[in-house]
UniProtKB/Swiss-Prot annotation:
UniProt keyword list: Cytoplasm, Methyltransferase, rRNA processing, S-adenosyl-L-methionine, Transferase
Gene: rlmG
Pfam family membership, one: MTS
SUPFAM superfamilies named among the record's database cross-references: S-adenosyl-L-methionine-dependent methyltransferases
UniProt-annotated location(s): Cytoplasm
Entry function: Specifically methylates the guanine in position 1835 (m2G1835) of 23S rRNA.
Protein name per the record: Ribosomal RNA large subunit methyltransferase G
Organism whose genome encodes this protein: Erwinia tasmaniensis (strain DSM 17950 / CFBP 7177 / CIP 109463 / NCPPB 4357 / Et1/99)
GO cellular component: cytoplasm
Keyword rRNA processing: yes
EC number in record: 2.1.1.174
Family of the protein in this entry: Belongs to the methyltransferase superfamily. RlmG family.
Taxon lineage: Bacteria, Pseudomonadati, Pseudomonadota, Gammaproteobacteria, Enterobacterales
Length: 375
């Protein structure tokens, strides 16, 4: 289903990357509907800031009303552009900002889709303190089961008095009034030492495993290729620890750090600059949709810990896209090496795509697989 019915119009909305027509996943959720229904009764005169609008449903519904859409996701921004075009809406009616850009001042209305990461929500609320006024309407929305006491306490601590709505279709709204409560400063960027190295790893708020190295990455770091004289991609780089290790083990290689998260790519760049400054000239950092736009038959190795979630939905289509892109971009003899949860059965997917797949190492929970592009 791709039609969202609103009180004053019908919107056609698709996920990005676009799913097969038979997929049950849609480009909006009940929290979007609840929030838009609520706004029907709230006239506003001034700019609207929208945070974490997953596929642009809110931006499309409110386009033309002085809308700014702020997201950490390059894919979400592309989805917004796609859905504006699908609905014959002018892209200029919605101004897109990444998660690290300064916010416009004195918004009349702030709409927040509650993110999965509490650290990202805190970063966004702290940034809002500098621009909202007591007259700003502040409304957040999310799944009722994901709005916890800690979520409400965060709004209250940073912005001011906070209340919630009744649940509707398992969604809930949060209402906050800005009263500028006293607030201690907080570190925006977390940092921790990487065992076995002299490095300090720095993470922006929306980066996976913000407080320390996750088990899968730790396992993967022990089984990376070495002595490659060519181009290596850390695909879905996160904070860049895999790419950092690839730099160390492949002193003649060029390493590309790619992710669809602006904060991930910024974290990767920071970690190279602070830990391996002499290697910075061998690096490229890009916010991107997998390997879209990269030339074919060029890369020597692609290293990847593919995600199996997009927002709150479990899906393998992003992993499939990464694998297909890797096969296209690898030169003959180049390899795709991944780490993944054992239950995801990437072995058969990679063997089907490449014609070969070998197990490099196994762990109680994870497996490392390698496929080589053959003529």
């Amino acid at each position: 289903m791709s039609q969202l019915e609103l009180s004053n119009r019908m919107l056609t909305l698709h996920r990005f990357p676009q799913m097969r027509e038979e997929s049950p996943l849609q480009a909006w959720d009940a929290a979007d509907e609840y929030l838009l229904n609520h706004l029907d009764n709230l006239p506003v005169n001034g700019p609207t800031l929208i945070f974490n609008d997953t596929f642009g449903a809110l931006a499309c519904a409110l386009a033309g009303e002085g809308v700014w859409s702020i997201s950490d996701s390059w894919l979400n921004q592309q989805a917004t552009r796609q859905n504006l075009a699908l609905n014959q809406l002018d892209e200029g009616d919605v101004r897109l900002l990444d998660s690290l850009a300064p916010l416009p001042g004195a918004p009349a209305r702030v709409l927040i889709k509650v993110p999965k990461t509490l650290a990202l929500l805190e970063k966004q609320l702290r940034a809002l303190r500098a621009v909202v006024t007591p007259e700003t309407q502040i409304v957040a929305a999310g799944k009722a089961k994901e709005i916890h006491t800690s979520t409400l306490q965060l709004f209250e601590k940073i912005l001011g008095p906070t209340t919630t709505s009744l649940a509707w279709k398992k969604a809930r709204l949060i209402y906050a009034t800005f009263t500028q409560p006293e607030l201690a400063e907080s570190e925006v960027i977390s940092r921790w030492p990487l065992d076995g190295t002299p490095w300090q790893i720095h993470n922006h708020a929306n980066v996976f495993a913000r407080g320390g190295l996750d088990i899968g990455a730790r396992f993967f770091m022990q089984h990376l290729p070495d002595d490659i004289d060519g181009e290596i991609v850390d695909l879905g780089c996160g904070n860049g620890v895999i790419g950092l290790m690839a730099l160390r083990q492949n002193p003649l290689a060029q390493v590309h750090f790619l992710d669809e998260s602006y904060m991930a790519v910024a974290s990767s760049r920071m970690n190279v600059e602070l830990n391996c400054p002499d290697d910075l000239a061998r690096c490229e950092f890009r916010v991107n949709n997998a390997l879209a736009g990269y030339p074919s038959d060029r890369l020597h190795a692609v290293l990847c810990n593919p995600p199996f979630h997009q927002q709150n939905a479990v899906t393998d289509h992003i992993a499939w896209q990464m694998f297909r892109d890797a096969r296209r971009c690898l030169q003959y003899g180049g390899e795709l090496r991944i780490v993944g949860n054992r239950h995801l059965d990437y072995y058969h997917k990679m063997k089907k795509l490449f014609g070969n797949c070998t197990t490099v190492a196994t762990h109680q929970k994870f497996v490392i697989l390698r496929s080589v592009k053959m003529p």
